[in-house]
């Protein structure tokens, strides 16, 4: 049954089917588990769409234009597209539910991938750039799915729920790039340019992910969680002047959660972006570069279930500090690693991935803790815009830093920046303890 806009209005009288969830913790738990399964299933396809397209975007643009100067444009375009889409998905999810917002993002991203294929067929650079921008919507949905898993989770389950969506993305993200050659051969066989082949997979994967959410994500977890929160009037009144019309939010908590995620994203993207270049300049082959980046990506996502458990068990403060300390270690190891030491570069990039994972899940949990369900999706979308832009800034600035100094200076800068996390987090949680 689809919830209408009327159903989402704050009211003391709820539809009977929705009242059943409000009155029954058992039904809430069943819906929570069902929602997680659907999100995990959709993310496997979403990850495949994400990984396959990113792998060859730069190569396709370079091939069509005939210049290496444009190799960075595709990344910038779909990163900017994902930032804009994150805002729109957050706003539409708040108004129409997670199902509409997330499914819409995946479906639009799939259309973007189809546009890339058409652009390659007719050799239209303008259409290629517009399509890559639209393709970013799939990336935005891919990242915002982690929030949907937390809508019905209690405070001790939120980081764990978010982590399940992240780790399921890994399955598709690993499979996608490994099918690049296969999809290229398939594209050749049907008369499509070889480098556009992976976008056939991306388009299909994003569209399948969207259809899964559109059909199966019912009832909408955000609508149900909002109704449950609105029914708990006594709890709302206890929170810092909260009311049903103006539900309480912890603005400082939101900002600290955002700072944790944004700094982790900025540091990770900056060092990750320049590591392949640094390795290439010192004689490492493509296979070695692929090994380092592959292990780094695995470290970004595979620890998610364990990280989620740690965040829920030991708290946001502990894991935020752990994120800062791990990113600090990553920057220092990268800075002191001899250029010909593959093992130390692997260690640095694995630490970088783990530190990012700690920061993303801790920041996500903190933002969820600090917002009322009736405002949550819009707030999450807003901060995912900043997350995407910080990644783009990290990638752009890293090249400038290395061009004017060195990879060592870049790594040390990342290490120093990571130290900012620790005092910010300690200040915030001391404030919480004083109020308690």
From Swiss-Prot:
SUPFAM superfamilies per record: MFS general substrate transporter
Subcellular location: Cell membrane
Similarity annotation: Belongs to the major facilitator superfamily.
Domain of life: Bacteria
Main location: membrane
Name this polypeptide is given: Uncharacterized MFS-type transporter YddS
Keywords linked to the UniProt accession: Cell membrane, Membrane, Transmembrane, Transmembrane helix, Transport
Pfam families: MFS_1
InterPro entries xref list: MFS, MFS_dom, MFS_trans_sf
Gene Ontology molecular-function annotations: transmembrane transporter activity
Membrane-crossing residue ranges in chain numbering: 38-58, 70-90, 102-122, 125-145, 160-180, 197-217, 254-274, 291-311, 319-339, 342-362, 383-403, 409-429
Entry-linked PANTHER family: MAJOR FACILITATOR SUPERFAMILY PROTEIN, MFS PERMEASE
Gene symbol of the encoding locus: yddS
One GO CC term on file: plasma membrane
């Amino acid at each position: 049954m689809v919830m209408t806009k009327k159903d989402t209005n704050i009211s003391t009288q709820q539809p009977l089917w929705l009242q059943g969830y409000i009155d029954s913790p058992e039904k809430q738990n069943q819906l929570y588990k069902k929602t997680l399964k659907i999100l995990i299933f959709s993310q496997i396809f979403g990850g495949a769409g994400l990984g396959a397209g990113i792998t060859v975007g730069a190569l396709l643009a370079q091939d069509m234009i005939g210049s290496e100067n444009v190799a960075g444009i595709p990344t910038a375009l779909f990163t900017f597209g994902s930032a804009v889409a994150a805002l729109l998905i957050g706003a539409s999810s708040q108004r129409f539910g997670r199902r509409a917002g997330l499914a819409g993002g995946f479906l639009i991203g799939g259309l973007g991938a189809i546009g890339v294929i058409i652009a390659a067929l007719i050799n239209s650079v303008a259409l290629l750039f517009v399509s890559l921008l639209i393709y970013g919507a799939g990336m935005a949905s891919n990242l915002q799915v982690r929030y949907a898993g937390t809508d019905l989770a209690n405070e001790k389950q939120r980081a764990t729920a978010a982590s399940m969506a992240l780790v399921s993305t890994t399955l598709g993200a690993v499979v996608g790039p490994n099918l690049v050659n296969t999809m290229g051969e398939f594209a050749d066989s049907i008369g499509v340019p070889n480098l556009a082949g992976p976008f056939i997979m991306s388009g299909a994967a994003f569209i399948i992910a969207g259809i899964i959410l559109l059909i199966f994500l019912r009832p909408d977890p955000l609508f149900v969680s909002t109704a449950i929160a609105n029914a708990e009037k006594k709890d709302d009144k206890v929170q810092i002047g909260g009311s049903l019309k103006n539900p309480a939010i912890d603005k400082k908590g939101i900002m600290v959660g955002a700072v944790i995620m944004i700094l982790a994203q900025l540091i990770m993207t900056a060092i990750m972006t320049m590591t392949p270049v640094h390795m290439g300049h010192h004689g490492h082959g493509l296979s070695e570069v692929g090994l380092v980046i592959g292990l780094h990506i695995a470290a970004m996502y595979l620890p998610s279930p364990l990280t989620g458990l740690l965040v829920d068990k030991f708290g946001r403060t502990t894991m935020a500090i752990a994120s800062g300390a791990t990113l600090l270690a990553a920057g220092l190891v990268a800075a002191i690693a001899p250029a010909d030491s593959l093992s130390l570069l692997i260690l640095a990039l694995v630490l970088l991935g783990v530190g990012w994972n700690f920061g993303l899940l801790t920041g996500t949990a903190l933002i969820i803790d600090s917002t009322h369900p009736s405002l949550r999706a819009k707030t999450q979308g807003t901060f995912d815009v900043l997350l995407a832009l910080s990644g783009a800034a990290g990638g752009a600035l890293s090249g400038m830093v290395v061009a004017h100094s060195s990879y060592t200076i870049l790594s040390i800068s990342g290490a120093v920046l990571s130290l900012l996390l620790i005092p910010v987090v300690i200040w915030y949680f001391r404030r919480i303890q004083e109020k308690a």
